[in-house]
Regions:
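Residues forming the flavin
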Residues: 1-181, 185-187, 191-196
C-alpha cells in the first residue's frame, strides 16, 4: 500500500503457482484497497468437546472429524456450518439443516428422504465455496512477500521484526515466542497467525 495518512496507491505483481513473486512490480493509483485475509473454520467448541480434528487444506484448515451430515465420534454430538470447513454461506446454512435432521433421526425421527434432497442442494452450494477456498489456501511463496514491518499476529500487533528479534535473543520454539511476545495469544487464540 502506498501513502502515509491515507491510501494513495498500491503495488501489484504476478505470482507463480506457489505465490512467489514473479516479474515486474506495477504501481496503481488508488484511494482505497480491499484485503481478504481468508476464512478459517471455527473449531473451538468441537475441539473443547474432545472431537478429534484433522488438517484439511481443502476445507480451510483444521476441522472436526465427522460423517457426511455432521455426526461425530461422540455419540449424539453433531457439528455443522463453517465450523466444519469453509464451503460458503449458503452451504453452511444447508449443512446446519442437514446436521439437525441427522440429530432428529438419531433421536428417532424419519428424515432420510428429506436429507437426500437437501444433501443434493448442499453439494451444489458447497462446490462454489470449496472452489473459493482452494484459491485462498496460503502457499509457500507467501512468506517471501513478508517485509520487516509485515504484521504477523494481528491481535497483538506483532511484526515480522518483533518475532525475528525474539528468536535472536534465544526463543527456540513457538511456545518460547508465545511466552515472550504473546504471539498467538490474543482474542483469536492464534487462529489467524498459527500457520505464520
Amino acid at each position: 500500500v502506498e501513502g502515509t495518512a491515507r491510501v494513495e496507491g498500491t503495488q501489484i505483481q504476478k505470482l507463480d503457482a506457489n505465490w512467489a513473486p514473479k516479474g515486474e512490480t506495477l504501481s496503481i493509483d488508488a484511494d482505497s484497497l480491499c484485503l481478504g485475509h481468508g476464512l478459517i473454520p471455527s473449531i473451538e467448541a468441537p475441539q473443547l468437546s474432545g472431537i478429534p480434528i484433522s488438517y484439511r487444506s481443502d476445507l480451510g484448515g483444521w476441522v472436526p472429524d465427522m460423517g457426511e451430515d455432521g455426526a461425530t465420534s461422540i455419540e449424539g454430538v453433531f457439528v455443522c456450518g463453517d465450523g466444519t470447513g469453509i464451503r460458503g454461506a449458503a452451504a453452511a446454512e444447508l449443512h446446519g439443516t442437514l446436521a439437525g435432521l441427522s440429530a432428529a433421526e438419531y433421536l428417532g425421527s424419519q428424515t432420510a428422504k428429506e436429507r437426500a434432497t437437501l444433501r443434493r442442494r448442499f453439494n451444489r452450494a458447497a462446490r462454489f465455496g470449496l472452489a473459493m477456498t482452494a484459491l485462498s489456501i496460503p502457499r509457500p511463496g507467501l512468506a517471501m512477500l513478508t517485509k520487516p514491518d509485515t504484521i504477523v499476529c494481528r491481535c497483538e500487533s506483532l511484526t515480522q521484526t518483533c518475532i525475528l528479534q525474539e528468536v535472536e535473543v534465544g526463543a527456540s520454539s513457538i511456545n518460547a515466542v508465545k511466552s515472550g511476545l504473546r504471539a498467538g495469544m490474543g482474542p483469536c487464540g492464534g487462529k489467524y497467525c498459527q500457520t505464520a
